[in-house]
Amino acid sequence: MQMDWLFIAVVSAIGLLSSGVPGTQGAYTTEQCRALNGTCRFYACFPKNVVIGKCDWLGWGCCARTPLERCTAKKGTCTASGCTETDTDHGPCDGGAQCCQRDPVKYCKFHGNVCGRGKCPMDHIPIGEQCMPGYPCCKRDGPAYCKSKGGKCLRRCSQIVPTDIIGVCADGVPCCKSRQSTG
């Protein structure tokens, strides 16, 4: 154990003497390496990391995650077609692809829906998506919306023949609209 520390101390001292002024000779200072989302490591990088340059200590490399690993850590996906307007762009991946993550709030609102607080507002129903934990994505529905679409709230749509169910007025009460006759 003592020999390991002695070896590291000797190599570090040699690195300090051989590098001269930190940041010279094309090597990164520790701060420059950190600015690139990297870490100065002795000898080898952790698995799933790559050497993106050398640090100003002899034998030390500036290690960082690969673009794919960085993207995966941010819960994104590398997409060759680029991000959509409902995505958050987390920067480049390999081969010109972009790291994109669907933004649940943008996605909900882009489709004309709203984010509820704990539950959906009146005249809205949850669509099964979450804007964030405890905030469901809700689409407009209910009696007022049903009427604005030319429908009626009836317990049984069979009261109007022929009909289509075009929404929900309340729990168990569909919004029914008569089909236009085509003849």
Swiss-Prot record:
Family statement drawn from the similarity comment of this UniProt entry: Belongs to the beta-defensin family. Helofensin subfamily.
Tissue spec. comment: Expressed by the mandibular venom gland.
Record-linked InterPro entries: Defensin_beta-like
Residue spans of the C(6)C(4)C(9)C(6)CC repeats: 27-64, 65-101, 102-139, 140-177
Keywords: Repeat, Secreted, Signal, Toxin
Classification lineage: Eukaryota, Metazoa, Chordata, Craniata, Vertebrata
Organism: Heloderma suspectum cinctum
Location relative to the cell: Secreted
Keyword Transcription: no
Primary location class: secreted
Listed GO MF terms: toxin activity
Designated name of the protein: Helofensin-1
Cellular component annotations (GO), alphabetically ordered: extracellular region
Superkingdom of source: Eukaryota
Signal peptide: 1-26
Described purpose of this protein according to its UniProt entry: Lethal toxin which possesses an inhibitory effect on direct electrical stimulation of the isolated hemi-diaphragm of mice. Neither hemorrhagic nor hemolytic activities are detected. Phospholipase A2 activity, proteolytic activity and arginine esterolytic activity are absent.
GO biological process entries: defense response
